[in-house]
């Protein structure tokens, strides 16, 4: 359908790709697109890191589209016996694999896999703290759907552990490309303001004032090499989005979170249950994964 062979980072997507993916995703949301379009195609989910939403979204999408879907248990594979990624990819290609969905705790490991993939298409489902392109497409589609089809000029506050967040990196790159005013709220020191970001602040109140969109991120302690990050109790005192702080944003603000949420840390129960768009975001994510698979393999 499209000419996209590898989706490793947001920059792999042309504007035409993005628009076509959103059109397809909207059709899947409205149940107007054809299922079974990938009948006979073999897709392997190669996840080196735990996942709930992303893995489920891809597995459900693959099966709904009629593909032969296999999730490789890396802990029980020959990779744990010392087999190289190159040999693993060669084996999968020899077995007729058409597309590999990869998640890794190592940044840019997916690039090495893509180099060894031969004719297999490759999707990055999140690599270390580098990128998560399908989540960025999901978030862009969610915002467009809830904000009248346009993100240009919207104030988007990305709040939390931005330094370790692949979601933040991909969203900053994609949303700024389409004219969003990106603000970053983080307790961490930022020596270099990323391209596309208009404000970096340690104050949640400053960052979310007048915001159209608030995107919350969890603390990713598993990616921290030292223990100098503040405790959850201190973090929640300074950075938890509760109803009082939410009132600083616009009345029609949408609250997003890529998951998993840590209630009582970055988001209060009241905001999570009464003001967030998280479940709609998940629904959009399922449609986006169908759209990406259809676009690349259909």
Swiss-Prot record:
Organism this protein belongs to: Anaplasma marginale (strain St. Maries)
EC class name: transferase
UniProt protein name: Aspartate carbamoyltransferase catalytic subunit
GO CC entries: cytosol
Gene: pyrB
Family classification: Belongs to the aspartate/ornithine carbamoyltransferase superfamily. ATCase family.
Recorded catalytic activity of this chain's protein: carbamoyl phosphate + L-aspartate = N-carbamoyl-L-aspartate + phosphate + H(+)
Origin: domain of life: Bacteria
Record: residues binding carbamoyl phosphate: 53-54, 103, 132, 135, 259-260
Binding site for L-aspartate: 81, 166, 218
One of the Pfam families matching this protein, by short name: OTCace_N
InterPro entries for the chain: Asp/Orn_carbamoyltranf_P-bd (IPR006132), Asp/Orn_carbamoylTrfase (IPR006130), Asp/Orn_carbamoylTrfase_sf (IPR036901), Asp_carbamoyltransf (IPR002082), Asp_carbamoyltransf_Asp/Orn-bd (IPR006131)
Keywords: Pyrimidine biosynthesis, Transferase
